Amino acid sequence: MTMADKRRRVLLKLSGEAFGGGQLGVNPDIVSGIAREIAQAATDVEIAIVVGGGNFFRGAELSQRGMDRGRADYMGMLGTVMNSLALQDFLEQAGAETRVQSAIEMIQVAEPYIPLRAERHLEKGRIVIFGAGAGLPYFSTDTVAAQRALEIIADVVLVAKNGVDGMYDDDPRTNPDARKIDQISHQEALKQNLKAVDSTALSLCMDNGMPMRIFGMEPAGNVTAALLGAEIGTLLG
């Protein structure tokens, strides 16, 4: 394959909360819609996905209620596997060939996480979903998205946000005067302590020259557009 033939390779980060539509568990209508948008771009783009687990468990929040942080994080990781399997099913219904790789071994439902195998799947046109976070406590799925993107040599990390359409200088949900940022460096985002993604993920991308685009999942069509390279939301790089 020549450089001219090389397809764009992206790492898409999806929030778990989006899968539940604000409720506990998985909303089939929402996940089906997300899957159709991803499948539309899969013929032109190599797509890997990291899914959060916030619609089931959030380790940091459970630990604040007295639960051991490590155990709470492992519960969150298992939630991401459930989301990964749900997304796999709806992607395959939409006609996309898909593989799930889990950082925690569970061979009945997913392949183990093997970066070179993931790259081969991508080259063959399969969508790869990474479940179980990093397989280690204290790592957010934002950080895992950055790490996986670097390891599979993605061109960009795309962070799909629920309820916000990019990075702002303050929380637009509480401050109506918050200003949307079209482009900013990783370093400046860290310096300003902007909260759209976690600081460890930003640092990883900054240190390794990985661009990141933060965009809103709505309206319909945004996920497909971002995967295909549309300049929506906020570019960090």
Curated annotation (Swiss-Prot):
Main location (coarse class): cytoplasm
GO terms of molecular function: ATP binding; UMP kinase activity
Keyword Glycoprotein: no
Pfam families: AA_kinase (PF00696)
Signal sequence extent: none
UniProt keywords, alphabetically: ATP-binding, Cytoplasm, Kinase, Nucleotide-binding, Pyrimidine biosynthesis, Transferase
Any one GO CC term of the record: cytoplasm
A Gene Ontology BP annotation from the UniProt entry: UDP biosynthetic process
Compartments, as annotated in UniProt: Cytoplasm
Residues reported to bind UMP: 53, 73, 134-141
Leading EC class: transferase
Chain positions recorded as ATP binding sites: 13-16, 54, 58, 162, 168, 171
Subunit structure: Homohexamer.
Entry similarity comment: Belongs to the UMP kinase family.
Protein name per its UniProtKB record: Uridylate kinase
Lineage: Bacteria, Bacillati, Actinomycetota, Actinomycetes, Micrococcales
Designated gene of the protein: pyrH
